[in-house]
């Protein structure tokens, strides 16, 4: 069984009723520290914040490694040296990817950013939630 960190791009679609890809069960999903902060950033009020935070607690939380900033700097540099892709990849996605790599987890997403990361991080597992789901 692989644990999958849920990126906000896929999380929004799952909350709206999308079905996880074959082979990924809802019990396989987790969030990470930066993913939680990214999700809560969208809260519209204190009540909404508290409600969303409670909902997120249903997921296992994978903590960032102690060297996360060094890891993200290296990843950003590797992307910059690979056809200048660094400026197109949001910082939260870099933190999520490095947290996933640390835990040997994958990332379930619905955007292009993780495909770029996979180019410079062989072995990084990313699964895209397709539009039809």
UniProtKB/Swiss-Prot annotation:
EC number: 3.1.-.-
SS bond partners: none
Residues engaged in binding Mg(2+): 7, 93
Enzyme class: hydrolase
Cofactor dependency: Mg(2+)
GO molecular function, one term: RNA nuclease activity
Similarity comment: Belongs to the PINc/VapC protein family.
Record-given protein name: Ribonuclease VapC17
Organism: Mycobacterium tuberculosis (strain CDC 1551 / Oshkosh)
